[in-house]
Structure formats: structure tokens, C-alpha cells
A protein has these predicted regions:
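A short coil-to-beta-strand element that immediately follows conserved catalytic motifs
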Residues: 85, 137-142, 207-219, 277
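Conserved FAD-binding catalytic core of PHBH/FMO-like flavoproteins
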Residues: 121-200
Length: 331
């Protein structure tokens, strides 16, 4: 296995960092060393008021990680297991010659392989090139930031704010010594976010100030219908496969899950136990896509009528528990 990395990882890779502890089931090694915070309570608010708190129950809590620590940890595990790594490998061409894939970098370097896994995120050009993924890509406009102190955000508590962001929500996830701040809007590919305006309203309620935030805006590719995720010797995983949850913007769990399922399918295929990789698409549809179909429907209603959604949805006695179950991977 050879990992082709376009950029040398920056010291910080800021994202929400939330994922269900159920992801541990896909790894033969413990992930706890890179978990910054274990969430036991989720707080919901409407314009910083009308707050509702839900307790996470069950055996799979919600974990918060620093993305840079997670990436580095998983890369180290892969290298220790015998993977090779090529850095600053900016892929400009992928083509198949006979039964061998040829991958070419901007600087002229070439790699040949029996199979290719496309894992280069929401801006990946390759799904269109190989006619994989949804016919119409759906993007959420998002902002991810970090404040290097915790303010008054309580330990083990994640915050979801539904009133300040048009057609979306904002969040605050605690780390050991910081807070991951974010927001997203989900209904229209052309939607933009008034980041500064929202931060000025949201951060003071957390005991934080806008001058303390370091972050960036980006487009996040979200699930937009069942689609083919594999070709002959080629697979899409993670954001490149449009697997991000269209309701709560959860991206880490489907990225890790799809990586696990891709590896399993490739192993059977390379060993000659199966003739194609079609089982990968079917497995992702069954284990993730069917839930995302419901997530898309909920998103379309909730974010189009957010105040009614908050009153009739989040404030219903059973709703916080349901959202907590989604976050912990039980639904």
C-alpha cells in the first residue's frame, strides 16, 4: 500500500472533530490516546436561549478529537504496518493501462497500482472524471475555527445552536485546552455564511471573543442520494464519496467507515475471492446511505423552517435523546 499525500500536513487541521466512539469497532488498536474529550451531555439552544440539555447514554459516547492528531495517529499506524508514504505528490492524472493504474504527479513522478482509493476530500475532481458519486453534487457552506481556551463551555458538553445560522446551525465542541467552533448552512449550494456576524452573537455566550478565533470557510460535499462508489479497481471514500451527513454534518465517522469497508472489499478482490468491487457500493448504501436518505429529508424540513423545527423537534421530550443516539452511533 502506498499513500499519496498532496500537502505536508499543517500543524493544525481544524474541523468539528466530533465522532461516535463506535468507530473503535473498525480498528485493531485503541483510539483513546488521541481523544481530547468524551461528551456525556449535549446542549441545544435557539439564538443562545431556550436551551435544552440531553444526556448521552449507552456504551458509545461522542468523542471530540483534534483532526491533526487523528490524521497523524492513523498515518503512524499505517506506516508501522508497512505502508509507504509519498509526500507533496500532487496528482494530476489517473489512467488505466491494461489492468494497471498509472498515477502521475505534477512534478512528473509516477506510481503504478492494481487499485486506487480516492480519498482527497470534498474538492476532489476525480469522482466526475470516473463518473462515480452522485450525478449532482451537493455542498454545504461551512466554517471551522478554534479558540485556544475553553471559556465557559462545560467539560464533556457539546453545544448546538440552531437560531443564528440561516438554513443551518453552529456548534462548539470542547477539547482539553481549547474549543472547536463551527457552523454550516445546508439547503442551497450558493448559500454563504455571515461568519463574523454569527461569531459576534455566538461566542460571547460561550465566554469567548471573536478576536481569539483562528479558522477558515470551506465547501463540504454532503450526501445527495445513492450512487455508484466503485469502478473496476477504483473506489471513493469519505468526503470524496459525498458521505457527509446532510443534517448534522458528521464526516469523520463515514470517512473511517468507508475506509474500513474499502480495505475489506479490496482484500477480497485482490485475493481473487470476488470478481468486482460492487459489494463496496452496496455495503455503504446499506450501512450508511439508507440513514442519510432520512437525514436529507429531515434536513430539508428542519432547516427550511428552523424555528418550528426547534420547537416541534428539538424541544419534544424524545427529540434530544434521538439526536444523542445519532451522535453516539446508535441510530
Amino acid at each position: 500500500v502506498c499513500i499519496l499525500e498532496k500537502n505536508i500536513s499543517s500543524p493544525e487541521r481544524i474541523c468539528g472533530g466530533g465522532m461516535s466512539a463506535a468507530v473503535q469497532n473498525w480498528f485493531p488498536f485503541k483510539l483513546q490516546p488521541i481523544v481530547d474529550e468524551v461528551i456525556t451531555n449535549v446542549e441545544f439552544s435557539w439564538c443562545n436561549t431556550d436551551k435544552v440539555v440531553a444526556e448521552l447514554s449507552g456504551s458509545s459516547p461522542f468523542w471530540i478529537v483534534k483532526r491533526e492528531k487523528l490524521d497523524s495517529f492513523l498515518l503512524d499506524q499505517a506506516l508501522n504496518a508497512g505502508c509507504n508514504l509519498l509526500t507533496t505528490f500532487n496528482v494530476v492524472n489517473i489512467k488505466k493501462i491494461s489492468n494497471v493504474w498509472q498515477i502521475t504527479a505534477l512534478d512528473g513522478r509516477q506510481v503504478e497500482a492494481k487499485a486506487v482509493v480516492i480519498a482527497d476530500g470534498s474538492q476532489s475532481p476525480w469522482p466526475k472524471t470516473f463518473n462515480l458519486g452522485p450525478n449532482q453534487q451537493k455542498f454545504a457552506s461551512t466554517y471551522s475555527g478554534r479558540v485556544k481556551r475553553k471559556g465557559n463551555l462545560r467539560d464533556e458538553t457539546a453545544r448546538f445552536e440552531f437560531g443564528l445560522v440561516k438554513n443551518g446551525f453552529a456548534w462548539a465542541f470542547p477539547l482539553k485546552d481549547a474549543v472547536n467552533i463551527g457552523m454550516g448552512t445546508f439547503l442551497d449550494n450558493k448559500n454563504s455564511i455571515s461568519v463574523e456576524e454569527i461569531l459576534k452573537s455566538f461566542l460571547p455566550d460561550l465566554g469567548l471573543d471573536t478576536s481569539e478565533v483562528i479558522g477558515e470557510e470551506k465547501k463540504l460535499r454532503v450526501w445527495n442520494g445513492h450512487s455508484k462508489l466503485n469502478g473496476e479497481g477504483i473506489l471513493l471514500v469519505g468526503d470524496a464519496a459525498s458521505l457527509c451527513d446532510p443534517f448534522l454534518a458528521e464526516g469523520l465517522r463515514p470517512a473511517l467507515m468507508s475506509g474500513f469497508e474499502a480495505a475489506k472489499c479490496l482484500l477480497y478482490w485482490l485475493d481473487g475471492e470476488v470478481n468486482d468491487l460492487d459489494s463496496y457500493t452496496k455495503t455503504i448504501q446499506k450501512n450508511w446511505g439508507n440513514s442519510m436518505a432520512w437525514g436529507k429529508r429531515i434536513s430539508q424540513v428542519f432547516y427550511r423552517f428552523p424555528k418550528a423545527g426547534y420547537q416541534l423537534g428539538v424541544k419534544r421530550p424524545t427529540a434530544p435523546k434521538r439526536i444523542a443516539q445519532i451522535l453516539s452511533g446508535e441510530m
